Amino acid sequence: MKKKQFTILVLVLIIVVGIAALILSRNRPYKPTSFVVDGDNWSATVVDGSSILLELNNNSKEWSIISEPETFVSDFHTITENISEFHIIALNDGEGEMVFQCTKDDGSTVQYILALSISRHQKIHLQIDSLSFKECT
């Protein structure tokens, strides 16, 4: 009889430990990922997973946003002597493109696309997974 009780006790302990492990793994705290992407005359830093500091070289250029998606938005634009800095915030998960226009001193313009892929974690946290910044062709 004691062997049977011991076996039942071991099975119950295994089940309890398994359920506890499942609960703990599902309720892990979200840890945002930050990263930096550098390109020719630009740099983007993902901060706390859901916002970007985009720095664009200002040498004889003026930068402006001409189109924004629904998934992210720029809330401020700072201009220093050599850098235009845009602060971009993720609003929703999905993919989107923001179009920037560069106006040079001679009046010519070139457009660039900032493309983001944003995912959602634990229903409330947004994470920027990838970004690219390239000239429109």
Language-model features and meaning:
Residues 2-5, 19-137:
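Extracytoplasmic soluble-region selector
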Residues 1-15:
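N-terminal Sec-pathway targeting helices
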